[in-house]
């Protein structure tokens, strides 16, 4: 019985199976209560994202957690078991730390997973399925993830196209927060770009999209202005940065349109990042003096360099996770020793109280005080050395020199 981590992720299971074992936000509260009750662990946390579902329990058997997962989702053992991974004790703690630091993510070092783990922990506390051990484990994990972020370069370099596009803009403009940005498209990539821009303090964004309703929906979240593709020529002269990602088969921004905008800008430089395939911006735009055009290929080379940098940082991060997981288990073991010491002291005090009470009664009945005290001392000594004497005798008879040596050290028999 120990800390247990059971899970599947993007490396072990298909999207189809990951969907089947996922826990929706509306169900995860009751699911954690059910898991804690069914496995009799009392402590349970479920992490469920698009790329992974993981179950963490304390004081339970891994087989019981697997059985609960299969029963909850009505899946056969044959379907689930080949895709599962499981960790126990220190390895379970280390795995949680690796996951939270982004070391086990699809994109190495991505920061979003830490927020998702924190949300899962909060929900578990709300469900009442977290006690002292797992509370300490998760709080330590959050500190370790922060330590890894600050002491390594795991998250310093961009490894997504969206993040790389914004990072490039930050290198070109000394103060990106004061720039005006035109985003062309309203898909997932542009939405991620908008989020990175907002995180970097950009407040003036315009989103151009073929379907205005989709652009408007996105703009609500980021406080941006929505326009149609036909309105781009009117807004382009104001844009310091243009980032485009649509599914258009033909270019949306031509050389003539950009050249006209640059004239209206009185040749203030404009950064254009085309992350669409096929291209949204005509290649000839790069020939314009004040236009700086970068394509997805330019970004990809940056991403490849940065990924190599992250892999180096990950080696440092792994050592931190290993060390911190060991330290956490040291704390767990110290709790076990505290319980043992408390139990030993309680038992010894009970023996003492019983013998003292007998001695007091004998003295009250007129017994010889010297004889009563001597009898008390002898009986107390015999009671306290009984268990160690039995252990020493058993070790000696069995020829267990290792245990015999440990017992002698424990009893202080080898001290000068």
UniProtKB/Swiss-Prot annotation:
Top EC category: oxidoreductase
Site (Important for activity): 95
Protein's name in the database: Glutamyl-tRNA reductase
TM stretches of this protein: none
Domain notes: Possesses an unusual extended V-shaped dimeric structure with each monomer consisting of three distinct domains arranged along a curved 'spinal' alpha-helix. The N-terminal catalytic domain specifically recognizes the glutamate moiety of the substrate. The second domain is the NADPH-binding domain, and the third C-terminal domain is responsible for dimerization.
Any one of the GO BP annotations: protoporphyrinogen IX biosynthetic process from glutamate
NCBIfam families: hemA
Residue numbers binding NADP(+): 185-190
Note: During catalysis, the active site Cys acts as a nucleophile attacking the alpha-carbonyl group of tRNA-bound glutamate with the formation of a thioester intermediate between enzyme and glutamate, and the concomitant release of tRNA(Glu). The thioester intermediate is finally reduced by direct hydride transfer from NADPH, to form the product GSA.
Annotated family: Belongs to the glutamyl-tRNA reductase family.
Organism listed in the record: Shewanella pealeana (strain ATCC 700345 / ANG-SQ1)
Classification via PANTHER family: GLUTAMYL-TRNA REDUCTASE
């Amino acid at each position: 019985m120990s800390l247990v981590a059971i899970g599947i992720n993007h490396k072990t299971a298909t999207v189809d199976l990951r969907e089947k074992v996922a826990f929706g936000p509306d169900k995860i509260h009751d699911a954690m209560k059910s898991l804690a009750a069914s496995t009799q662990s009392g402590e349970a946390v479920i992490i469920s994202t698009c790329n992974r579902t993981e179950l963490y329990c304390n004081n339970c058997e891994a087989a019981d957690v697997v059985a609960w997962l299969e029963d909850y989702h009505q899946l056969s053992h044959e379907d689930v078991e080949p895709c599962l991974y499981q960790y126990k004790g220190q390895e379970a703690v280390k795995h949680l730390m690796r996951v939270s630091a982004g070391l086990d993510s699809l994109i190495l070092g991505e920061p979003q997973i830490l927020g998702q783990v924190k949300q899962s922990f909060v929900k578990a506390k709300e469900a009442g399925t977290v006690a002292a051990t797992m509370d300490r484990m998760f709080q330590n994990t959050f500190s370790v993830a922060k330590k890894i972020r600050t002491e390594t370069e795991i998250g310093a370099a961009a490894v997504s196209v969206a993040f790389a596009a914004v990072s490039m803009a930050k290198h070109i403009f000394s103060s990106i927060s004061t720039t005006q940005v035109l985003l062309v498209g309203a898909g997932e990539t542009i939405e991620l770009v908008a989020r990175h821009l907002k995180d970097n303090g950009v407040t003036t964004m315009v989103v151009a999209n073929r379907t205005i309703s989709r652009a408007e929906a996105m703009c609500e979240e980021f406080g941006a202005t929505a326009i149609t593709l036909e309105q781009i020529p009117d807004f382009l002269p104001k844009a310091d940065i243009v980032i485009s990602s649509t599914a258009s088969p033909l270019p949306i921004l031509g050389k003539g349109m950009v050249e006209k905008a640059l004239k209206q800008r009185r040749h203030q430089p404009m950064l254009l990042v085309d992350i669409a395939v096929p291209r949204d911006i005509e290649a000839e735009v790069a020939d314009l003096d004040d236009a700086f055009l970068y394509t997805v290929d330019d970004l990809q080379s940056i991403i490849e360099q940065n990924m190599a940098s992250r892999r180096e940082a990950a080696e440092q991060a792994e050592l931190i996770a290993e060390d911190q997981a060991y330290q956490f288990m040291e704390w767990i073991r110290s709790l076990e020793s505290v319980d043992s010491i408390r139990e030993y002291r309680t038992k010894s005090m009970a023996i003492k109280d019983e013998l003292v009470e007998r001695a007091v009664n004998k003295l009250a009945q007129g017994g010889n005080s010297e004889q009563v005290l001597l009898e008390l001392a002898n009986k107390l000594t015999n009671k306290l050395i009984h268990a160690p004497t039995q252990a020493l005798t058993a070790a000696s008879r069995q020829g267990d020199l290792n245990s015999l040596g440990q017992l002698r050290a424990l009893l202080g028999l080898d001290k000068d």
